[in-house]
């Protein structure tokens, strides 16, 4: 059941189970809508082949609803349930909800904040896709969310794709893997936090392949990457991502303010795009002669970078081979 208040532009949903997502439908065939005079009429589903009143009501909800309140008892927000609600700025999700379906809130471009209750176990692909003003996604403490994508190695599967205003993202502790496209289009990210069980990109984790393709975590505003202290796979050193043994540099944030970075002693290798697109970076000091660099795109589009290296070092050979500016240090 649902009803809509035209004065407050609020859609209230009650019942048990899920919401109906057939075509543009969001609830069930017994849905009702308040008229201005307080009476109700049955509009069936949101399908465009319904009555004239039904079509008008569907259009009104999609274009004018500003607030959605889902009452306790609803367990699933079905696929595309509220997609393209043009005026939606706020949605309240109760602790009874366990699943948010694919594209559930896609293209809700006025939505700015959302809180995911701890009860949610799965968030489908594209759930918040193209919510271009969504700057805050908060997972309640003790989140049970363990799945956030349906097709982990395909573009378009991320629930937050093209959330261009998203500033921070804290991965729920139960998430182990994401696809390499997960942060695609999240151009305003300043901080990312990974939970205690997070390992890396699905299908690429292993020996030294974790985060070897960071194609989507390329926000030029990203200043720091955080990792839960109890995570056995990853480590954050001053906001820079390493493996737990601190021997492999995985990702240097693109928006880091400092123009100089000294690679810690003990670092044995770097991922294939660890410094890619770090155009603020001017100086990288590598004093370890034995450190081996293999990937040409490691410093791709680092337009101002100079490597400070030891003579007769592996890194010196790499700089020469890849035509990267370098200076010899004692």
Regions found by a protein language model. Give the residues of each.
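Extracellular, modular beta-sheet/disulfide-rich ectodomains of secreted and cell-surface proteins
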Residues: 1-9, 15-29
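Structural signature of tandem-repeat unit edges
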Residues: 8-17, 63-76, 86-99, 109-122, ...
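Surface-exposed intrinsically disordered loops and tails
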Residues: 27-57
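Extracellular leucine-rich repeat
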Residues: 46-48, 81, 100, 123
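Leucine-rich repeat
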Residues: 50-60, 158-160, 214-216
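Acidic, glycine/polar-enriched metal-coordinating patches/loops
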Residues: 299, 322
């Amino acid at each position: 059941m649902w009803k809509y208040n035209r004065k407050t532009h609020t859609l209230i949903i009650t019942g048990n189970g899920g919401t109906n997502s057939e075509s543009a439908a969001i609830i069930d065939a017994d849905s009702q809508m308040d008229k201005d005079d307080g009476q109700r009429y049955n509009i069936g589903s949101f399908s465009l082949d319904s009555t004239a009143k039904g079509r008008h009501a569907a259009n009104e909800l999609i274009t004018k609803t500003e607030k959605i309140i889902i009452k306790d008892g609803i367990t699933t927000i079905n696929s595309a349930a509220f997609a393209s609600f043009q005026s939606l700025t706020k949605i309240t999700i109760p602790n009874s909800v366990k699943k948010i379906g694919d594209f559930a809130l896609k293209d809700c471009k006025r939505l700015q904040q959302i809180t995911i209750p701890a009860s949610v176990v799965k968030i489908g692909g594209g759930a918040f896709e193209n919510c271009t003003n969504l700057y805050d996604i908060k997972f309640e403490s003790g989140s049970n969310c363990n799945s956030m994508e349906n097709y982990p190695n395909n573009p378009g599967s991320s629930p937050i794709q093209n959330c261009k205003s998203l500033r921070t993202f804290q991965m729920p502790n139960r998430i182990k893997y994401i696809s390499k496209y997960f942060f695609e289009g999240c151009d305003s990210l300043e901080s990312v936090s990974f939970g205690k069980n997070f390992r890396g990109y699905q299908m690429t984790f292993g020996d030294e392949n974790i985060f070897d393709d960071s194609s989507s975590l390329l926000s030029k505003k990203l200043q720091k990457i955080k990792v839960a202290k109890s995570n056995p796979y990853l480590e954050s050193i001053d906001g820079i991502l390493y493996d737990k043994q601190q021997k492999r540099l995985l990702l240097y944030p693109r928006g880091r303010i400092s123009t100089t970075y000294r690679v810690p002693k003990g670092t044995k290798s770097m991922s294939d795009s660890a410094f890619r697109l770090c155009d603020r970076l001017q100086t990288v000091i590598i004093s370890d002669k034995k450190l081996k660099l293999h990937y040409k795109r490691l410093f791709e589009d680092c337009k101002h970078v100079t490597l400070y290296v030891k003579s007769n070092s592996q890194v010196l050979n790499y700089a020469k081979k890849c035509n990267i500016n370098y200076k010899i240090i004692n």
